[in-house]
Amino acid sequence: MTDQRGSLAGTLSSNGILRVAGSASGTLVGLYLVLLQASRIGSAGAGTAGTLGASAYAAELLFSIPLGVLADAWQPRWVMVAGALLGAVAVQLFGLTHNSAIFFLSRVLEGISVAAVTPPLLAWLADRTEGDLRARARVMSFFELSLLAGLAMGGVAATQLWSHFHGTAFSLVAVGYLLAALLLALFAGGGGTAPGHNALAGLRLALRDDHVRRLAPVWLCVNAVTGLWLGPTLAFLITSPSAPHRSQFFNGLYAADPTQFGWVLLGYALLFATGVTGWSMVLARVGVHRAMLISLATMLPVCLGFYLVNHAGGASSGYRWTIGIATALLILVETGFTPAALSWLAGSLHGGVGKGSAMGIYSVLLSVGAIGGSLMAGWLGNLFRFDGLLLGTVLLAVAGLLLMARIPQDAPADSGETIR
Protein backbone atom coordinates (compact mmCIF):
# COMPACT_ATOMS: atom_id res chain seq x y z
CA MET A 1 0.00 0.00 0.00
CA THR A 2 2.84 2.37 0.90
CA ASP A 3 4.61 1.60 -2.37
CA GLN A 4 1.40 2.25 -4.29
CA ARG A 5 0.87 5.58 -2.53
CA GLY A 6 4.44 6.60 -3.29
CA SER A 7 4.02 5.57 -6.91
CA LEU A 8 0.79 7.54 -7.23
CA ALA A 9 2.26 10.58 -5.47
CA GLY A 10 5.36 10.61 -7.67
CA THR A 11 3.36 10.18 -10.86
CA LEU A 12 0.82 12.86 -9.95
CA SER A 13 3.70 15.18 -9.04
CA SER A 14 5.16 14.62 -12.49
CA ASN A 15 1.79 15.56 -13.97
CA GLY A 16 1.85 18.79 -11.97
CA ILE A 17 5.33 19.60 -13.26
CA LEU A 18 4.26 18.87 -16.83
CA ARG A 19 1.30 21.21 -16.42
CA VAL A 20 3.56 23.92 -15.02
CA ALA A 21 5.85 23.52 -18.02
CA GLY A 22 2.98 23.47 -20.52
CA SER A 23 1.28 26.51 -19.01
CA ALA A 24 4.59 28.36 -18.79
CA SER A 25 5.34 27.55 -22.41
CA GLY A 26 1.98 28.93 -23.57
CA THR A 27 2.51 32.16 -21.62
CA LEU A 28 6.08 32.52 -22.90
CA VAL A 29 4.78 32.24 -26.46
CA GLY A 30 2.53 35.25 -25.91
CA LEU A 31 5.32 37.26 -24.26
CA TYR A 32 7.80 36.34 -26.99
CA LEU A 33 5.37 37.46 -29.70
CA VAL A 34 4.90 40.79 -27.92
CA LEU A 35 8.70 41.22 -27.95
CA LEU A 36 8.88 40.43 -31.66
CA GLN A 37 6.07 42.86 -32.39
CA ALA A 38 7.77 45.61 -30.39
CA SER A 39 11.04 44.89 -32.23
CA ARG A 40 9.17 44.95 -35.57
CA ILE A 41 10.33 41.42 -36.33
CA GLY A 42 7.73 39.63 -38.43
CA SER A 43 4.02 40.36 -38.17
CA ALA A 44 3.09 38.74 -34.87
CA GLY A 45 -0.29 39.66 -33.42
CA ALA A 46 -3.27 38.29 -31.51
CA GLY A 47 -4.24 36.25 -34.57
CA THR A 48 -0.80 34.62 -34.68
CA ALA A 49 -0.99 33.82 -30.97
CA GLY A 50 -4.39 32.22 -31.37
CA THR A 51 -3.32 30.17 -34.39
CA LEU A 52 -0.22 28.90 -32.59
CA GLY A 53 -2.39 27.80 -29.69
CA ALA A 54 -4.75 26.05 -32.08
CA SER A 55 -1.87 24.19 -33.76
CA ALA A 56 -0.86 22.64 -30.44
CA TYR A 57 -4.43 21.60 -29.71
CA ALA A 58 -4.77 20.17 -33.24
CA ALA A 59 -1.71 17.97 -32.75
CA GLU A 60 -3.07 16.78 -29.41
CA LEU A 61 -6.37 15.99 -31.10
CA LEU A 62 -4.80 13.93 -33.88
CA PHE A 63 -2.50 11.91 -31.64
CA SER A 64 -4.51 11.38 -28.43
CA ILE A 65 -6.37 8.23 -29.46
CA PRO A 66 -3.46 6.60 -31.37
CA LEU A 67 -1.14 7.16 -28.41
CA GLY A 68 -3.86 5.94 -26.05
CA VAL A 69 -4.05 2.74 -28.08
CA LEU A 70 -0.25 2.49 -27.93
CA ALA A 71 -0.42 2.76 -24.14
CA ASP A 72 -2.83 -0.19 -24.10
CA ALA A 73 -0.48 -2.28 -26.21
CA TRP A 74 2.76 -1.18 -24.52
CA GLN A 75 3.87 -0.04 -21.06
CA PRO A 76 2.17 3.35 -20.40
CA ARG A 77 5.25 4.51 -18.49
CA TRP A 78 7.47 4.65 -21.56
CA VAL A 79 4.83 6.35 -23.69
CA MET A 80 4.59 9.06 -21.03
CA VAL A 81 8.36 9.39 -20.67
CA ALA A 82 8.73 9.79 -24.43
CA GLY A 83 6.02 12.47 -24.37
CA ALA A 84 7.78 14.44 -21.63
CA LEU A 85 11.09 14.30 -23.52
CA LEU A 86 9.38 15.48 -26.70
CA GLY A 87 7.94 18.41 -24.75
CA ALA A 88 11.45 19.45 -23.71
CA VAL A 89 12.59 19.46 -27.34
CA ALA A 90 9.50 21.39 -28.45
CA VAL A 91 9.75 24.23 -25.96
CA GLN A 92 13.48 24.62 -26.59
CA LEU A 93 12.88 25.02 -30.31
CA PHE A 94 10.57 28.01 -29.90
CA GLY A 95 13.14 30.22 -28.20
CA LEU A 96 15.88 29.54 -30.74
CA THR A 97 14.49 31.35 -33.77
CA HIS A 98 12.28 34.07 -35.24
CA ASN A 99 11.10 31.72 -37.99
CA SER A 100 7.32 31.31 -37.98
CA ALA A 101 7.56 27.80 -39.45
CA ILE A 102 9.66 26.71 -36.45
CA PHE A 103 7.11 28.36 -34.15
CA PHE A 104 4.39 26.15 -35.56
CA LEU A 105 6.60 23.04 -35.49
CA SER A 106 7.36 23.70 -31.83
CA ARG A 107 3.71 24.03 -30.89
CA VAL A 108 2.76 20.91 -32.87
CA LEU A 109 5.44 18.88 -31.09
CA GLU A 110 4.24 20.18 -27.74
CA GLY A 111 0.70 19.12 -28.62
CA ILE A 112 1.94 15.61 -29.43
CA SER A 113 3.76 15.64 -26.10
CA VAL A 114 0.51 16.28 -24.24
CA ALA A 115 -1.22 13.53 -26.21
CA ALA A 116 1.53 11.09 -25.23
CA VAL A 117 1.03 11.82 -21.52
CA THR A 118 -2.62 12.52 -20.71
CA PRO A 119 -4.53 9.44 -22.02
CA PRO A 120 -1.82 6.97 -20.86
CA LEU A 121 -1.66 8.68 -17.46
CA LEU A 122 -5.43 8.54 -16.96
CA ALA A 123 -5.42 4.90 -18.04
CA TRP A 124 -2.54 4.15 -15.65
CA LEU A 125 -4.37 5.82 -12.77
CA ALA A 126 -7.54 3.87 -13.57
CA ASP A 127 -5.55 0.62 -13.65
CA ARG A 128 -3.83 1.33 -10.33
CA THR A 129 -7.18 1.98 -8.62
CA GLU A 130 -9.05 -0.93 -10.22
CA GLY A 131 -11.80 -2.24 -7.96
CA ASP A 132 -11.61 0.63 -5.45
CA LEU A 133 -14.06 3.33 -6.50
CA ARG A 134 -13.34 5.55 -3.51
CA ALA A 135 -9.61 5.48 -4.19
CA ARG A 136 -10.23 6.14 -7.86
CA ALA A 137 -12.38 9.17 -7.03
CA ARG A 138 -9.66 10.59 -4.80
CA VAL A 139 -6.92 9.94 -7.32
CA MET A 140 -8.84 11.48 -10.21
CA SER A 141 -9.56 14.51 -8.03
CA PHE A 142 -5.85 14.79 -7.29
CA PHE A 143 -5.22 14.55 -11.03
CA GLU A 144 -7.49 17.55 -11.64
CA LEU A 145 -5.94 19.47 -8.76
CA SER A 146 -2.41 18.74 -9.99
CA LEU A 147 -3.50 20.06 -13.38
CA LEU A 148 -4.90 23.23 -11.81
CA ALA A 149 -1.85 23.70 -9.60
CA GLY A 150 0.36 23.35 -12.64
CA LEU A 151 -1.65 25.91 -14.57
CA ALA A 152 -1.52 28.25 -11.59
CA MET A 153 2.23 28.05 -11.17
CA GLY A 154 2.95 28.00 -14.90
CA GLY A 155 1.85 31.57 -15.51
CA VAL A 156 3.84 32.86 -12.54
CA ALA A 157 6.90 30.82 -13.51
CA ALA A 158 6.77 32.05 -17.10
CA THR A 159 6.50 35.74 -16.25
CA GLN A 160 9.21 35.53 -13.59
CA LEU A 161 11.57 33.56 -15.84
CA TRP A 162 10.91 35.96 -18.71
CA SER A 163 11.59 38.95 -16.49
CA HIS A 164 14.96 37.60 -15.36
CA PHE A 165 16.19 35.46 -18.26
CA HIS A 166 14.21 36.51 -21.37
CA GLY A 167 14.82 33.99 -24.17
CA THR A 168 16.69 31.59 -21.88
CA ALA A 169 13.37 31.04 -20.10
CA PHE A 170 12.45 28.51 -22.79
CA SER A 171 15.47 26.38 -21.86
CA LEU A 172 14.55 26.49 -18.18
CA VAL A 173 11.03 25.33 -18.95
CA ALA A 174 12.56 22.47 -20.96
CA VAL A 175 14.38 21.41 -17.78
CA GLY A 176 10.96 21.05 -16.14
CA TYR A 177 9.92 18.61 -18.85
CA LEU A 178 13.11 16.61 -18.27
CA LEU A 179 12.43 16.45 -14.53
CA ALA A 180 8.91 15.18 -15.20
CA ALA A 181 10.30 12.51 -17.53
CA LEU A 182 12.63 11.33 -14.76
CA LEU A 183 9.79 11.10 -12.22
CA LEU A 184 7.62 9.16 -14.67
CA ALA A 185 10.44 6.71 -15.34
CA LEU A 186 10.90 6.17 -11.59
CA PHE A 187 7.31 6.03 -10.36
CA ALA A 188 4.94 5.16 -13.23
CA GLY A 189 5.74 1.46 -13.30
CA GLY A 190 3.20 -1.32 -13.36
CA GLY A 191 0.15 -1.59 -15.53
CA GLY A 192 0.05 -4.57 -17.77
CA THR A 193 0.00 -4.55 -21.50
CA ALA A 194 -3.09 -5.58 -23.46
CA PRO A 195 -3.46 -7.21 -26.86
CA GLY A 196 -4.00 -4.75 -29.66
CA HIS A 197 -7.46 -6.09 -30.50
CA ASN A 198 -8.55 -5.49 -26.88
CA ALA A 199 -7.41 -1.88 -27.09
CA LEU A 200 -9.36 -1.35 -30.29
CA ALA A 201 -12.39 -3.11 -28.82
CA GLY A 202 -12.35 -0.73 -25.86
CA LEU A 203 -12.18 2.21 -28.22
CA ARG A 204 -15.14 0.93 -30.25
CA LEU A 205 -17.24 0.41 -27.11
CA ALA A 206 -16.54 3.91 -25.83
CA LEU A 207 -17.27 5.53 -29.19
CA ARG A 208 -20.64 3.72 -29.38
CA ASP A 209 -21.70 4.72 -25.87
CA ASP A 210 -24.84 6.89 -26.05
CA HIS A 211 -23.98 8.85 -22.90
CA VAL A 212 -20.60 9.84 -24.33
CA ARG A 213 -22.14 10.94 -27.63
CA ARG A 214 -24.73 13.12 -25.89
CA LEU A 215 -22.18 14.74 -23.61
CA ALA A 216 -19.61 15.37 -26.35
CA PRO A 217 -21.07 18.56 -27.95
CA VAL A 218 -21.66 20.19 -24.55
CA TRP A 219 -18.14 19.37 -23.43
CA LEU A 220 -16.81 20.76 -26.69
CA CYS A 221 -18.44 24.11 -25.88
CA VAL A 222 -16.93 24.18 -22.39
CA ASN A 223 -13.50 23.17 -23.67
CA ALA A 224 -13.73 25.92 -26.27
CA VAL A 225 -14.13 28.35 -23.38
CA THR A 226 -10.93 26.85 -21.96
CA GLY A 227 -9.17 27.47 -25.28
CA LEU A 228 -10.41 31.07 -25.27
CA TRP A 229 -8.86 31.91 -21.93
CA LEU A 230 -5.84 29.63 -21.55
CA GLY A 231 -4.27 30.12 -24.99
CA PRO A 232 -1.62 32.74 -25.82
CA THR A 233 -4.19 35.34 -26.92
CA LEU A 234 -5.08 36.45 -23.38
CA ALA A 235 -1.42 36.96 -22.48
CA PHE A 236 -0.95 38.97 -25.68
CA LEU A 237 -3.95 41.23 -25.02
CA ILE A 238 -3.12 41.86 -21.37
CA THR A 239 0.59 42.56 -21.87
CA SER A 240 0.73 44.18 -25.31
CA PRO A 241 1.62 47.91 -25.12
CA SER A 242 0.10 48.52 -28.55
CA ALA A 243 -3.40 47.25 -27.72
CA PRO A 244 -6.06 49.57 -29.17
CA HIS A 245 -9.47 50.32 -27.59
CA ARG A 246 -8.01 51.94 -24.51
CA SER A 247 -11.56 52.37 -23.16
CA GLN A 248 -11.26 48.74 -22.06
CA PHE A 249 -9.60 48.42 -18.66
CA PHE A 250 -7.92 45.05 -19.29
CA ASN A 251 -6.29 45.89 -22.64
CA GLY A 252 -2.55 46.30 -22.10
CA LEU A 253 -3.14 46.35 -18.34
CA TYR A 254 0.24 44.77 -17.58
CA ALA A 255 2.22 46.09 -20.53
CA ALA A 256 4.60 47.91 -18.19
CA ASP A 257 5.14 44.85 -15.98
CA PRO A 258 4.16 41.52 -17.59
CA THR A 259 5.13 39.63 -14.42
CA GLN A 260 1.88 40.80 -12.84
CA PHE A 261 -0.07 38.75 -15.37
CA GLY A 262 1.44 35.58 -13.93
CA TRP A 263 0.14 36.42 -10.47
CA VAL A 264 -3.33 36.99 -11.89
CA LEU A 265 -3.22 33.51 -13.44
CA LEU A 266 -2.10 32.08 -10.11
CA GLY A 267 -4.99 33.70 -8.28
CA TYR A 268 -7.51 32.55 -10.88
CA ALA A 269 -6.23 28.96 -10.84
CA LEU A 270 -6.30 28.83 -7.03
CA LEU A 271 -9.85 30.16 -7.10
CA PHE A 272 -10.78 27.51 -9.67
CA ALA A 273 -9.15 24.76 -7.59
CA THR A 274 -11.10 25.90 -4.53
CA GLY A 275 -14.32 25.64 -6.51
CA VAL A 276 -13.49 22.14 -7.79
CA THR A 277 -12.69 21.01 -4.24
CA GLY A 278 -16.00 22.38 -2.99
CA TRP A 279 -17.97 20.72 -5.78
CA SER A 280 -16.34 17.36 -5.00
CA MET A 281 -18.07 17.46 -1.61
CA VAL A 282 -21.56 18.40 -2.82
CA LEU A 283 -21.73 16.92 -6.31
CA ALA A 284 -23.37 13.68 -5.19
CA ARG A 285 -26.21 15.60 -3.52
CA VAL A 286 -26.68 18.17 -6.28
CA GLY A 287 -26.58 15.62 -9.09
CA VAL A 288 -24.34 15.48 -12.14
CA HIS A 289 -26.88 16.81 -14.65
CA ARG A 290 -27.97 19.70 -12.44
CA ALA A 291 -24.35 20.59 -11.65
CA MET A 292 -23.53 20.89 -15.35
CA LEU A 293 -26.57 23.12 -15.91
CA ILE A 294 -25.73 25.37 -12.96
CA SER A 295 -22.10 25.71 -14.06
CA LEU A 296 -22.98 26.62 -17.63
CA ALA A 297 -25.62 29.13 -16.58
CA THR A 298 -23.21 30.80 -14.14
CA MET A 299 -20.78 31.60 -16.97
CA LEU A 300 -23.19 34.32 -18.12
CA PRO A 301 -23.13 36.49 -14.96
CA VAL A 302 -19.38 35.88 -14.68
CA CYS A 303 -18.94 37.43 -18.13
CA LEU A 304 -21.19 40.30 -17.09
CA GLY A 305 -18.98 40.93 -14.07
CA PHE A 306 -15.83 41.03 -16.19
CA TYR A 307 -17.56 43.32 -18.68
CA LEU A 308 -18.58 45.78 -15.96
CA VAL A 309 -15.03 45.95 -14.61
CA ASN A 310 -13.59 46.24 -18.13
CA HIS A 311 -15.78 49.29 -18.80
CA ALA A 312 -15.76 50.82 -15.33
CA GLY A 313 -13.84 53.82 -16.68
CA GLY A 314 -13.47 56.40 -13.94
CA ALA A 315 -15.43 54.38 -11.38
CA SER A 316 -14.09 54.15 -7.85
CA SER A 317 -11.87 51.29 -6.72
CA GLY A 318 -14.64 50.28 -4.30
CA TYR A 319 -16.99 49.69 -7.23
CA ARG A 320 -14.40 47.56 -9.03
CA TRP A 321 -13.69 45.55 -5.87
CA THR A 322 -17.40 44.92 -5.25
CA ILE A 323 -17.96 43.67 -8.79
CA GLY A 324 -14.71 41.69 -8.68
CA ILE A 325 -15.56 39.88 -5.44
CA ALA A 326 -19.05 39.02 -6.68
CA THR A 327 -17.56 37.68 -9.91
CA ALA A 328 -15.01 35.61 -7.98
CA LEU A 329 -17.80 33.97 -5.97
CA LEU A 330 -19.62 33.13 -9.18
CA ILE A 331 -16.43 31.59 -10.61
CA LEU A 332 -16.46 29.16 -7.67
CA VAL A 333 -19.89 28.01 -8.83
CA GLU A 334 -19.03 27.66 -12.52
CA THR A 335 -16.13 25.29 -11.75
CA GLY A 336 -18.54 22.42 -11.22
CA PHE A 337 -18.81 21.42 -14.86
CA THR A 338 -15.50 19.55 -15.14
CA PRO A 339 -15.92 17.21 -12.13
CA ALA A 340 -19.55 16.63 -13.12
CA ALA A 341 -18.67 15.83 -16.73
CA LEU A 342 -15.78 13.57 -15.68
CA SER A 343 -18.15 11.70 -13.37
CA TRP A 344 -20.60 11.32 -16.25
CA LEU A 345 -17.86 10.04 -18.54
CA ALA A 346 -16.42 7.71 -15.88
CA GLY A 347 -19.81 6.05 -15.53
CA SER A 348 -19.92 5.48 -19.28
CA LEU A 349 -16.45 4.01 -19.80
CA HIS A 350 -15.99 0.28 -20.17
CA GLY A 351 -13.18 -0.67 -17.81
CA GLY A 352 -12.48 -4.18 -19.04
CA VAL A 353 -10.21 -3.39 -21.95
CA GLY A 354 -8.73 -0.44 -23.79
CA LYS A 355 -8.48 2.07 -20.94
CA GLY A 356 -5.96 4.20 -22.81
CA SER A 357 -8.13 4.28 -25.92
CA ALA A 358 -11.20 5.27 -23.94
CA MET A 359 -9.31 7.94 -22.02
CA GLY A 360 -8.12 9.30 -25.35
CA ILE A 361 -11.69 10.49 -25.91
CA TYR A 362 -11.23 12.87 -22.97
CA SER A 363 -8.24 14.48 -24.68
CA VAL A 364 -9.94 14.55 -28.07
CA LEU A 365 -12.94 16.43 -26.70
CA LEU A 366 -10.60 18.81 -24.91
CA SER A 367 -8.50 19.39 -28.02
CA VAL A 368 -11.36 19.91 -30.47
CA GLY A 369 -13.01 22.43 -28.21
CA ALA A 370 -9.76 24.17 -27.37
CA ILE A 371 -8.82 24.49 -31.06
CA GLY A 372 -12.07 26.27 -31.77
CA GLY A 373 -11.71 28.39 -28.66
CA SER A 374 -8.14 29.41 -29.46
CA LEU A 375 -9.03 30.35 -33.04
CA MET A 376 -12.10 32.21 -31.80
CA ALA A 377 -9.91 34.07 -29.29
CA GLY A 378 -7.54 35.21 -32.03
CA TRP A 379 -10.39 36.34 -34.28
CA LEU A 380 -12.53 38.05 -31.64
CA GLY A 381 -9.42 39.42 -29.91
CA ASN A 382 -8.43 41.22 -33.10
CA LEU A 383 -11.94 42.63 -33.49
CA PHE A 384 -12.93 43.52 -29.93
CA ARG A 385 -9.83 42.93 -27.79
CA PHE A 386 -10.74 41.72 -24.25
CA ASP A 387 -14.46 42.14 -24.92
CA GLY A 388 -14.06 39.59 -27.71
CA LEU A 389 -13.13 36.89 -25.19
CA LEU A 390 -16.25 37.71 -23.17
CA LEU A 391 -18.44 37.60 -26.27
CA GLY A 392 -17.05 34.21 -27.27
CA THR A 393 -17.66 32.84 -23.77
CA VAL A 394 -21.28 34.00 -23.77
CA LEU A 395 -21.96 32.43 -27.17
CA LEU A 396 -20.42 29.11 -26.13
CA ALA A 397 -22.22 29.03 -22.77
CA VAL A 398 -25.59 29.63 -24.46
CA ALA A 399 -24.84 26.89 -27.00
CA GLY A 400 -23.93 24.51 -24.18
CA LEU A 401 -27.15 25.26 -22.32
CA LEU A 402 -29.21 24.56 -25.43
CA LEU A 403 -27.36 21.28 -26.05
CA MET A 404 -27.94 20.16 -22.44
CA ALA A 405 -31.54 19.45 -23.46
CA ARG A 406 -30.26 16.34 -25.28
CA ILE A 407 -28.71 14.88 -22.12
CA PRO A 408 -31.02 12.78 -19.92
CA GLN A 409 -31.23 13.79 -16.27
CA ASP A 410 -30.35 10.27 -15.13
CA ALA A 411 -26.58 9.90 -14.99
CA PRO A 412 -24.81 6.72 -16.19
CA ALA A 413 -24.98 3.95 -13.64
CA ASP A 414 -21.44 4.28 -12.31
CA SER A 415 -21.25 8.07 -12.03
CA GLY A 416 -22.60 8.27 -8.55
CA GLU A 417 -19.97 5.85 -7.31
CA THR A 418 -17.08 7.92 -8.62
CA ILE A 419 -18.03 11.03 -6.65
CA ARG A 420 -18.70 9.58 -3.23
Give a label for each model feature.
Residues 106-145:
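Cytoplasmic helix-loop-helix junction between adjacent transmembrane helices
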Residues 354-382:
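A late C-terminal transmembrane helix in Major Facilitator Superfamily
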Residues 168-185, 389-405:
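Symmetry-related core transmembrane helices of the 12-TM Major Facilitator Superfamily/SLC fold
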Residues 1-5, 188-218, 420:
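Juxtamembrane intracellular "pre-TM" segments in multi-pass secondary transporters
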Residues 85-98, 298-316:
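C-terminal ends and interior cores of transmembrane alpha-helices
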Residues 61-97:
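Conserved MFS/SLC helix-loop-helix module at the cytosolic interface between two early adjacent transmembrane helices
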Residues 51-68, 266-278:
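Central cavity-lining transmembrane alpha-helices of secondary-active solute carriers
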Residues 2-57, 213-214, 218, 223-248:
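Helix-loop boundary and gating motifs at the non-cytosolic
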